[in-house]
Amino acid sequence: MDYSYDEDLDELCPVCGDKVSGYHYGLLTCESCKGFFKRTVQNNKHYTCTESQSCKIDKTQRKRCPFCRFQKCLTVGMRLEAVRADRMRGGRNKFGPMYKRDRALKQQKKAQIRANGFKLETGPPMGVPPPPPPPPDYMLPPSLHAPEPKALVSGPPSGPLGDFGAPSLPMAVPGPHGPLAGYLYPAFSNRTIKSEYPEPYASPPQQPGPPYSYPEPFSGGPNVPELILQLLQLEPEEDQVRARIVGCLQEPAKSRPDQPAPFSLLCRMADQTFISIVDWARRCMVFKELEVADQMTLLQNCWSELLVLDHIYRQVQYGKEDSILLVTGQEVELSTVAVQAGSLLHSLVLRAQELVLQLHALQLDRQEFVCLKFLILFSLDVKFLNNHSLVKDAQEKANAALLDYTLCHYPHCGDKFQQLLLCLVEVRALSMQAKEYLYHKHLGNEMPRNNLLIEMLQAKQT
């Protein structure tokens, strides 16, 4: 059965930005990407990228790199299982109910638009930056001061942030009773994600500060999907995450009393942020039902994307164009990054800021953020899972919840759902660039000892 869509909504293909022709393999796409995806799957083609696997895919350049185009097809939600293996015309009719539901929502929206007497405006085509947000949201004061984080354990000093903007905090190599012990084994190849405290650690890890507390159930007004409400309850408060991380960074040095380089300190911040993300994942519905092996596989696949999204959303909330906010509450001017950081890190930060501006223009809210975070965790491109069906079901429910939420709460922005999924593509590209940067630093022997991020990189490669 052919599922049509309303052409006067002027939807754009989430892969290349061309005009969509209908529902193909799980979502609305153009005819070109439909044919490309079908040929790739049916012919079992394997592509390679001659660049860094982050090529720009738009209407004019979609044929230049089939590897990146196919990866983008998967990322935005095209379904491998929807392609017929017998090479006959037509896809496997598994998604009829979802298509009908999506079409009904769009028709309802079109009726709303006609009743209100205006035409829905879509976002800019692929490759065209969104219009800048209103200037008042990004006005900078004459001088920047670090905000006072709540509930900090001996809060970070307000003085200069070293030679690169990192707070001047004593650092120690995490001992056996650090936060890592409660989640992972000492060597990552043997680590697991557990709530118990495995040998050789006989006692629970001692973490500074009180345990995380989580928000009261959020009603969110009418029409907030149940999945999003549950995810909001799982999300820890930012000031408590900050307090924990600052507390860990301020532990007295045990084996290295020397003052660490600012880059080393940033790596420690990222380590501690990742530990908080692991804690979130362990409590996530569906994830906690998976076998440990599947949990590890999912985290190995998406750890860098979750870290990037965490940083991006912090900047969206922070709302300043010419500086960034670290997880510790410290502010760093981009001009400082330009002068003190290397060109690779500076370009990475600037690329991240471009995505921040895009999400700010899209009015990304907390409900959408937690849903995007969940979608990244349960990526469908992960191979060798023991329970792939559970992961697939979680992905489909999260997609449906995000679609419902955006259509209901942002009726003036009918393609917000697709725009958010496109932003996930950029999050992935950023994460790949960040991993390349970390590995470059690792090869130069510039990474701190016992760095969890490097262990994650090496585990992915083995």
Curated annotation (Swiss-Prot):
Q: Its biological function?
A: Transcriptional activator. Seems to be essential for sexual differentiation and formation of the primary steroidogenic tissues. Binds to the Ad4 site found in the promoter region of steroidogenic P450 genes such as CYP11A, CYP11B and CYP21B. Also regulates the AMH/Muellerian inhibiting substance gene as well as the AHCH and STAR genes. 5'-YCAAGGYC-3' and 5'-RRAGGTCA-3' are the consensus sequences for the recognition by NR5A1. The SFPQ-NONO-NR5A1 complex binds to the CYP17 promoter and regulates basal and cAMP-dependent transcriptional activity.
**What InterPro entries does the entry give?**
NHR-like_dom_sf, NR5-like, Nucl_hrmn_rcpt_lig-bd, Nuclear_hrmn_rcpt, Znf_hrmn_rcpt, Znf_NHR/GATA
Q: Which residues bind DNA?
A: 10-85
Glycyl lysine isopeptide (Lys-Gly) (interchain with G-Cter in SUMO) cross-link, renumbered residues: K119, K194
- Record-linked CDD domains: NR_DBD_Lrh-1_like, NR_LBD_SF-1
Single GO BP term:
adrenal gland development
> Any idea which residues bear Phosphoserine here?
S203
SMART domains registered for this protein in UniProt = HOLI, ZnF_C4
Where does this protein chiefly localize?
nucleus
Highest taxon above the source species? Eukaryota
Q: Which residues bind a 1,2-diacyl-sn-glycero-3-phosphocholine?
A: G342, Y437, K441
At which residues is N6-acetyllysine found?
K34, K38, K72
User: Which parts of the sequence are annotated with region: Disordered?
Assistant: 117-149
Protein's UniProt name: Steroidogenic factor 1
Q: Describe the location of the NR LBD domain by residue ranges.
A: 223-460
Q: Name one GO molecular function term.
A: DNA-binding transcription factor activity, RNA polymerase II-specific
Q: Where is the composition biased (Pro residues)?
A: 126-139
Q: Could you state what the record's PTM comment says about this protein?
A: Acetylation stimulates the transcriptional activity.
Query: Quaternary arrangement and interactors, per the entry?
Result: Binds DNA as a monomer. Part of a complex consisting of SFPQ, NONO and NR5A1. Interacts with NR0B2, NCOA2 and PPARGC1A. Interacts with DGKQ and CDK7. Binds to and activated by HIPK3.
**UniProt zinc finger (NR C4-type) residues:** 13-33, 49-73
What family name appears in the similarity comment?
Belongs to the nuclear hormone receptor family. NR5 subfamily.
What is the organism of origin for this protein?
A: Rattus norvegicus
Gene Ontology cellular-component annotations? cytosol; nucleoplasm; nucleus; RNA polymerase II transcription regulator complex
> Which keywords does this Swiss-Prot/TrEMBL entry list?
Acetylation, Activator, DNA-binding, Isopeptide bond, Lipid-binding, Metal-binding, Nucleus, Phosphoprotein, Receptor, Transcription, Transcription regulation, Ubl conjugation, Zinc, Zinc-finger
